[in-house]
Regions:
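Low-complexity intrinsically disordered segments
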Residues: 48-142
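Short, extreme N-terminal segment that most often corresponds to the first beta-strand
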Residues: 2-26, 147-148
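Prokaryotic Sec-type signal peptides and long signal-anchor helices
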Residues: 14, 36, 139-141
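Short non-domain terminal segments
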Residues: 8, 30, 42-45, 83, ...
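A structural detector for beta-sheet-dominated domains
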Residues: 22-23, 35, 43-45, 104, ...
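Charged, amphipathic alpha-helical linkers/stalks
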Residues: 29-51
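Long alpha-helical, hydrophobic tracts
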Residues: 1-2, 32
């Protein structure tokens, strides 16, 4: 029997189980500049129907914040009260040493590639600190938008 050992890969012998494993080896240090209060300043993004790949830390965090805008009833002040925002902010601040995330709200938010209504941030598990950190800071993780 031939055996193949892959580091950092979870594998089962079941053909009906599929896993996605992201190695922590791709984590980069933060590229965010902190404001005078030690906060990361982020604005909403425009994530349309065009086919595009977003790889920068700023774009990936902006995507999460833009998702929260839609989950919060289209109100910036309500985002700060969302449990999901607290989870994302805690993970990002722990990783970067920032004191918080400040949403600028200068740009009009847009997510136009998703055909399902928003009920949750399904792109990552915000309960899992490592998932948040890997999504934002791992150079091997990108966000691809497209239209179905």
């Amino acid at each position: 029997m031939k055996r193949k050992i892959r580091k950092g890969v979870f594998e089962t012998n079941s053909s009906s189980v599929h896993s996605l494993v992201v190695s922590n080896e791709g984590r980069e240090s933060s590229k965010f500049k902190l404001n005078k209060d030690g906060e990361i300043e982020i604005d909403f993004g425009q994530f349309g129907k065009d086919e595009r790949i977003y790889s920068s830390q700023y774009d990936k965090l902006s995507y999460l914040i833009t998702c929260l805008y839609y989950l919060s009833g289209y109100d910036i002040s309500d985002i700060y009260d969302k449990w999901e925002f607290e989870q994302i902010q805690d993970a990002v601040c722990k990783y970067t040493g920032a004191t918080g995330i400040k949403i600028l709200g200068k740009q009009e938010p847009e997510i136009d590639h998703q055909s399902q209504p928003y009920g949750d941030i399904e792109i990552i598990n915000v309960y899992d600190e490592d998932a948040v950190i890997n999504f934002v800071f791992n150079k091997y993780v990108s966000l691809k938008t497209d239209c179905d």
